[in-house]
Amino acid sequence: MEKKQIINISIIIPVYKVEAYIERCIKSVATQEGIGSAYNLECILVDDCTPDRSMEIAKETIKQYENIHFICLRHEVNRGCSVARNTGLEYATGEYIMFIDSDDYVLPNCLKSFTDEIIKDPAIDMVIGSTIINNKTDIKERELLKGKESIIHGFLTMKYLITSWNKLVRKECITENKLLFIENIYLQDQPWLYYLASHIDSMLLLPNTTYSYEEAPESASHGVLNPEKAQRYVNSWNTVFEYYLSHRPNSKDFKHNLETDFLLYLQRTHLRAIMLFPYEKKDYNRILRFRDKIMSLALKDGRLIIACFLLLEYKPFIYLFKFKFIRSHYYYMVKTVGRIAHLFDFVHRKN
């Protein structure tokens, strides 16, 4: 009788100021279906010098479970989520990696759903499940993306959430490409996932609901920012945009031109940056410089459809986003513009 394949998984959880949530998070991991039969599990908790009782609660909680190998690591000083994840990666022994934010939790079927798919198709480099956000889920149908072109296209068109969590990733894809999170910035998931998408060959999107995202009341989307945080967000956006601009997809490598998707993604990301919360004038102007860089790229490449759409970020058109109708239909506007722009790409290639 053929021996059943057992997959080894490492889960990495940064811990900082989450005493109200950490027990729930750990229990959701420890009570996963299939531990020991479908896969072996280690869980790495990285204490990022948390000042509250988070680690005390975590250590009490893990005593209840012997079916998982828990590793507790500690930073001597607070270094941020990026470094905590990088630290976890150093110690991870699993063939596959999953990141979980400590104020979130995974549903009971999460890891078994992922590993069942990998056992059926070992070529899959990453499995992504559907996430509950505000009582809604994001992935509606199963889809296997094969080849870098399809995977990068999926990123740029946001077929899946631009996050590091709720994704089971082959560890080799991370370590062989020296893929670490950028330190000292917010939004660190964006460049990390973009680079990862450029270095894997097979990705599976699952409609199975596997992860619950809990938005913290103090998060940026609620507009609660002191001057220091605002400055850090501006620096973070600048880092992210510079990263994207220096890692443009080489369209010569693909059958279809990804430049249209790339420019529309930049425009959508930039619009979110300038509308997320009010900045001081000097910070706002720093972010606007990237709007002009995106416009320059579009014009230089002769993408007039994209350039016209980018005018929405300039006065007086930017004021249209004060209307709820425009905001709620913006996603569909992007898709429509993308289709039209791709049609012109096709005509151009034919000629």
Language-model region placement:
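Cell-envelope/extracellular polymer assembly enzymes that use nucleotide-activated donors
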Residues: 7-10, 42, 191
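Short beta-strand/loop segment that forms part of the nucleotide-sugar
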Residues: 39-49, 71-75, 102
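Donor-binding/catalytic cores of nucleotide-activated saccharide
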Residues: 82, 102-205, 213-228, 249
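Short aromatic/hydrophobic "clamp" motif used to bind/position activated sugar donors
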Residues: 97
